[in-house]
């Protein structure tokens, strides 16, 4: 049996930002602690995975050595956006492209690898996002979370967060919809309106 394993390398500041906690702007990080632990576990298990890296973390010089160690130990790296905003799907196409490109460059600078895989923060995706990824020659996107419990996950998140009513409104599609629970669990291909099958 074949399996694909990946990990979203969401840093401390990204959780603080999404939850509405003060102090995230100083980008507190625990990457220097958790990445070596993950890598040691994966070495012991003799498995290689894909780490989806947030561009903002890769842009911070103090994180570059630990992010480079991911590639040095034989793992793949993917793009997890630059700003890790779970409302990415609400961005204009131009803003999405800027977000993807900015993360690509930061991840390349930190790791020496170009990204060809993407996962949206908070499993955020849109047709515009997929078209941007296609244009930029990405080979796969893992932003879709095919589960029926997305609305429950979102409500729990709102309950536990310190977000204002307006912030909650901007995140109302976080984790996807009930309808997305009907998408396949195995890889599949998107066909865009301007494409032929």
Residue ranges of predicted features:
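Active-site beta->alpha N-cap acidic-glycine motif
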Residues: 1-73
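Generic detector of short, locally flexible boundary/turn motifs and exposed helical patches
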Residues: 14-18, 42-45, 81-85, 106-108, ...
